[in-house]
Amino acid sequence: MKRKCQDYESRLPDNTAVKQQQLPAFRLQLTASEILSGFFAIGLFCLGMGIILLLSAKSIKEVEINYTEKCATCAKLREEATNFDKECNCSISFYLPQKMEGNVYLYYKLYGFYQNLYRYILSRSNIQLVGADVKDVRNCAPFRTSDNGLPIAPCGAIANSMFNDTIVLWYNFNSSTHIRVPMVRTETAWWTDKYVKFQNPAFQNLSSAFAGTAKPPNWPKPVYELDENDPGNNGFINDDFIVWMRTAAFPNFKKLYRRLHRIGNFTEGLPAGSYSFIINYNFPVSRFQGQKAVVLSTLTWSGGSSLFLALAYLVTGAVTLLASFSMMALHLKLKERKTFFLQ
């Protein structure tokens, strides 16, 4: 019997704080006043951030010009597929009442274009876009190969539907002097997209790298000729192409097109005065009953003119404060009842 007791005791864990699970621990016991203070602090913080973000968004200067109806003649021309090789330009004049100081950004905006459709998003080849194999078109239905059987580069529905209007901004200094506003067409894409997700094939000559492939059906030129003025902005690393390939979550969206080159008369930004947009109309929107617009905008430390983040903070802060006052009222009521019974 004694031996059995010794065997049993030998199997017991050591009598230490760790093995006996007797380590000292801090057990947080929050009081009602501490919880209410935390809720009030969170609510006030969210309200304060919402007000700051709202004021920041309101300080942004933005001009949006819808040119769907103003370029109706060109739109009608583009409805016929046989007119794809006919050039059509339209001019849109507007007046800028106040100077847009600092960096100014030019966007194109589409209404009613659903880039978030499941089959549309999947219609691309990431293997092709990183330059590993320009003939990889496995996931690009229905735009895999051309009528001649050649693999399309870049393939897929996203690339084929790329926005291809050409937008030029002119400053009408006076009735006889018109100055083209200098714009930068690079550094408009995300850094990770430009240098990680999109790469050209490892060839010095891009035309040779894309030999044996065909351009997308809706494109007027192959991918290695997208920028005739800058050889370093051609192929899969073209900024306009990369920006378009980052699909939007909502049917109404804007994408960065150009940045103001702050030189000459535009060192401090866009001066107030008369301007004109000359648009080479190529992208049809009547087929899906959409609309097109150009947007000139400045930015602040908080980003663009979207009010979503500011409203989200304001709503969160308001709901939190409302809950705080409700809990405080309930706490005081229960406290009074407890005091009454103790008496």
Swiss-Prot record:
Q: What's in the keyword line of the UniProt record?
A: Glycoprotein, Membrane, Transmembrane, Transmembrane helix
* Record field: transmembrane: 35-55, 307-327
Chief localization class? membrane
> InterPro entries this protein is in?
CDC50/LEM3_fam
The lineage's top-level taxon is Eukaryota
User: What residues bear carbohydrate chains?
Assistant: 66, 164, 205, 265
- Decide whether keyword Membrane is in the record: yes
Location within or outside the cell: Membrane
Biological process GO annotation list? Answer: phospholipid translocation
Q: Name one GO cellular component term.
A: endoplasmic reticulum
Q: Which residues lie on this side of the membrane: Extracellular?
A: 56-306
Its family remark reads: Belongs to the CDC50/LEM3 family.
PANTHER family xrefs: CELL CYCLE CONTROL PROTEIN 50, CELL CYCLE CONTROL PROTEIN 50C
Q: What is this protein called?
A: Cell cycle control protein 50C
Which organism is the protein's source?
A: Bos taurus
The lineage is:
Eukaryota, Metazoa, Chordata, Craniata, Vertebrata
The gene is TMEM30C
